[in-house]
Design a protein with these regions (language model features):
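Bacterial N-terminal signal peptides that target proteins for export
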Residues: 1-9
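C-terminal motif of bacterial Sec signal peptides marking the signal peptidase cleavage site
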Residues: 18-19
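Short, conserved catalytic or interaction motifs in soluble domains
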Residues: 22
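Signature of exported/secreted
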Residues: 27-288
């Protein structure tokens, strides 16, 4: 059963899917150290070009997510946090001119702090399928009008891991895309449109091997409306984010990925407006 904690709205019953859809305000420039993170990598002298040949087969990732939300009222500042991690297996196969994919989640764990409602038990495994082509990722599930927060989170992971990549790039190369993702906030279906800008920073030495560093900058607009108990709720959000991709230089596969995002959320219910600031970060690490 969902509950109200005073004026604290149940925004983060799970990690907000559309807040994790994109890659927060940390400066993405190479060479700047971020607090609490390892020093920024040093670019090699190579300027490319690098050519990619997409690889079929199976790879696995451990994905950790952290989100915090803050509401400032006249009387107090209220903060909550939630963390989760998943182990996801991603398989790619050639299907004509496109690639088909299957993502399987066999581990999903949630840790909450504060007034956030404990997450429901997740039935495992979770499987999503779809295809990857010139038009980007096409997801066969979840449906846009569904409200399965966990499956929507996994769908967002796929958009992060299977980001578009030109067949050949050089240092300084830039490209853009726009993706639409579907999430679930407190039982309210949400739709987010994310505009992403990719820039090739160059080759770096990472874990004693050369990888290609690609930076991403995002802007997000999200909307949702529906019933929460006896209340009509409207959710709106705008945010900005960054991401750092460490890619295999031969295949373009993701070896490691870090995303950060800061989102301003407004919730209207029963004629009252509530404002929140949400910060999220994700770390994707390939484990096989």
């Amino acid at each position: 059963m969902q509950r109200w904690c005073g004026n604290w709205l149940p925004i983060l019953l799970t990690v907000s899917t559309w807040a994790c859809a994109a890659g927060s305000r940390p400066d993405p420039r190479v060479g700047r150290d971020l607090p609490g993170r390892t020093p920024a990598p040093v670019l090699t002298s190579s300027a490319g070009p690098w050519s990619f040949s997409p690889a079929t087969g199976t790879r696995a990732y451990r994905i950790s997510r952290n989100a915090s939300i803050e509401e400032v009222t006249d009387s107090a500042v209220r903060r909550d946090a939630v963390s989760n991690f998943t182990h996801e297996i991603l398989t790619l196969e050639q299907a004509g001119e496109e690639m088909s994919f299957r993502a399987v989640v066999d581990t999903f764990a949630v840790i909450t702090q504060g007034a956030i409602e404990p997450a429901q038990i997740v039935a495992l495994p979770i499987e999503l399928t779809g295809s990857l082509g010139m038009a980007g990722v096409r997801m066969e599930s979840p449906a846009p009008d569904s409200c399965d927060a966990v499956r929507a989170t996994v769908a967002t992971d796929i958009h992060n891991l299977l980001a578009p990549m030109p067949s050949q790039v050089s240092r300084g190369a830039v490209w853009r895309d726009v993706i639409t993702t579907y999430g679930c906030q407190a039982g309210i279906p949400t739709t987010a449109v994310t505009r992403r800008l990719f820039t090739v920073a160059g080759e770096v030495e990472h874990s004693s091997r050369p990888l290609l560093l690609v930076q991403r900058v995002d802007s997000v607009d999200a909307r949702g409306e529906g019933a929460y108990g006896q209340h009509r709720m409207k959710v709106e959000g705008t945010g900005t984010g960054t991401a750092l991709y460490y890619l295999e230089t031969a295949s373009g596969e993701v070896s490691q990925l870090t995303t950060n995002q800061r989102t301003r959320i407004t919730v209207t219910t029963s004629g009252r407006l509530h404002s929140f600031t949400q910060t999220t970060n994700q770390d994707f690490v390939r484990v096989r």
